Amino acid sequence: MAVYDQSGDRNRTQIDTSRKRKSRSRGDGTTVAERLKRWKEYNETVEEVSTKKRKVPAKGSKKGCMKGKGGPENSRCSFRGVRQRIWGKWVAEIREPNRGSRLWLGTFPTAQEAASAYDEAAKAMYGPLARLNFPRSDASEVTSTSSQSEVCTVETPGCVHVKTEDPDCESKPFSGGVEPMYCLENGAEEMKRGVKADKHWLSEFEHNYWSDILKEKEKQKEQGIVETCQQQQQDSLSVADYGWPNDVDQSHLDSSDMFDVDELLRDLNGDDVFAGLNQDRYPGNSVANGSYRPESQQSGFDPLQSLNYGIPPFQLEGKDGNGFFDDLSYLDLEN
């Protein structure tokens, strides 16, 4: 800080380098953590004494900044009491009950942390009727750690870590030795696990369904093939259709009614059959070397005489001067 004298010349310069920016506080000098603690104690006292049913707080606005203002992801943020700065940081603030003033809750690296800080402040201010961004998150105590603390919470699994503010007005996690676990991250992991389980169950169900369908089609195909083969066997002819089946009893058949085909063919190729027939029909005849010689000729019997049925023999005589038959005397008709 520079000090000037009445002449306007600078005679002394004093620069205070030890001054740091204090945390934001209200006009009465109380910090945000102290104010939240007061609201929490007030709500606990009112719930114990009052018998009237309290009104549910108004929904309020969830639009955040005006359209076109704030950070690039501000328009996609739907958390209550959370908005994004143009440089990417997220801030949270809450309005006190009965249309009170707004309380600055701090700056956070993610929207989820800012939303969790808002929930803690809402629980302290409005009690069990508070409208929360994460209704299923566990309740945590709101305490005051120092004159520079903002929204301070007890570190439990699934809750927001303690936030403090440095001279540059940016919130940093309070060193507690344990990494913070946030409700949204746990919820997101559980949802992912549930989705994976559902996908696994769905894929298994689809696999079993299509396997059963394919098995049914294979059975129908095999059954159709078997029926086709049976139909072809019924339509086709077998040995039983052309001859005697193997299981037919042939004892009642007479052997004289049967003949051997091979023997018949052998007899047809030879001369024995004709010899036997001639001997049976003409006992007086003989067949020798394939030449037929009647037995009547062998004994001097004249076949012409055997054919004489009482008719006088034919005589060739010329009549009426016709000498045609005279020249035929040289023929030996008897021989």
Swiss-Prot record:
Biased composition regions of type Basic residues, renumbered to the chain = 52-66
List residues annotated as DNA-binding: 78-135
Q: List, alphabetically, the GO terms of the cellular component aspect.
A: nucleus
Q: What tissue specificity is annotated for this entry? A: Expressed preferentially in roots and stems, and at a lower level in leaves.
| InterPro entries tied to this protein | AP2/ERF_dom, AP2/ERF_dom_sf, DNA-bd_dom_sf
* Predominant location: nucleus
- What Gene3D superfamilies does UniProt report for this protein, alphabetically? AP2/ERF domain
**What Pfam families does its record include?**
AP2
SMART domains cross-referenced by the UniProt entry = AP2 (SM00380)
Which example biological process does GO assign this protein? positive regulation of DNA-templated transcription
Induction profile = By high-salt and drought stresses.
Q: Where in the cell is it found?
A: Nucleus
Region Disordered, residue ranges:
1-32, 50-74, 279-304
> Which GO MF term does the entry hold, naming one?
transcription cis-regulatory region binding
Q: What's the subunit arrangement here?
A: Interacts with MED25. Binds to DPB3-1 in the nucleus during heat-stress.
Annotated function:
Transcriptional activator that binds specifically to the DNA sequence 5'-[AG]CCGAC-3'. Binding to the C-repeat/DRE element mediates high salinity- and dehydration-inducible transcription. Promotes the expression of heat stress-inducible genes by contributing to the formation of a heat stress-specific transcriptional complex with NF-Y subunits (e.g. DPB3-1, NF-YA2 and NF-YB3) at the promoter of target genes, thus promoting heat tolerance.
- The molecule here is called Dehydration-responsive element-binding protein 2A
Which species is this UniProt entry from?
Arabidopsis thaliana (Mouse-ear cress)
Q: What is the lineage of its organism?
A: Eukaryota, Viridiplantae, Streptophyta, Embryophyta, Tracheophyta
